Amino acid sequence: MEMVLAFLGFLACLIALGYGLYHLVRYVLKKEKRFSKRLFWPLFIGGLVLLFTGAALAEPDTAAANAEKKYSALNAEYKNLTKEHEELEKEYKSVSSEAKKLKDNKEDQDKLEKLKNENSDLKKTQKSLKAEIKELQENQKQLKEDAKTAKAENETLRQDKTKLENQLKETESQTASSHEDTGSSSNNTSKSDETKTADKAEGCNIKGSRNGIYHTPGSTYYDRTTDPAEMFCSVEEAEAAGYRAPKR
């Protein structure tokens, strides 16, 4: 899945760059401006997001695989060194046994000295092998911990991915619900405004014209004022709003 995301991201980026290069060449040669930013930028940015997402998801698996390979190689080397150590142990015991037998034989002093030197060299080699084995054991332990950590990080990333997908679904559901609530609220508000307007029209019949004059029912210009700026329920209310009575 991670490789598919990375491949799709790379392909989208490649198409976007090809599209941009094609229109750049056409602009240079023919001065044509038909480049669509709405097509180029979403395709290019979406490709980068897919590419980086695929690479990020694939990285923990790669790290775990590399750790497993290193662990296998070190384990094989550890077994080889252990085998060599056992062989040297046998050889050391054999040389020690021969040295003990030749110790009382004065005629073989040279051979005894040679065996002592060999024995000393074997001890040094044995000590070096023990140090290497200890180091390999520590490296082996560290690789086990690295592999365990890589697997844990991989599992954490998968859980985060699942959590993000669930959050995305929840957000989409909330968005759809919000649109429905908004539509319902708008309808209720419109009905409320219509009701208020009707009530005002029935009880408040003093018209305020746009030139600052109010007209009461039965006055000369009352019926002629067909588009009042405001409606008032009383003369006091109209005068308080800055309107005056007509001169005639």
Swiss-Prot record:
Protein name (database record): Uncharacterized membrane protein YttA
Q: Where is the signal peptide?
A: none
Sorted UniProt keywords: Cell membrane, Coiled coil, Membrane, Transmembrane, Transmembrane helix
Bias class Basic and acidic residues marks the residues at: 140-182, 191-202
- Could you tell me which residues belong to the region Disordered? 94-123, 140-221
> Where is this gene product found?
Cell membrane
Q: How does it sit in the membrane?
A: Multi-pass membrane protein
Q: Spell out where the chain crosses the membrane.
A: 4-24, 39-59
Does the keyword field hold Membrane? yes
Task: Summarize induction of expression.
Answer: Negatively regulated by TnrA under nitrogen-limited conditions.
Q: What is its main location?
A: membrane
Q: GO cellular component annotations, sorted alphabetically?
A: plasma membrane
Identify the species of origin. Bacillus subtilis (strain 168)
Per the record, the coiled-coil ranges are 61-178
**Per the record, a Pfam family?**
LMBR1
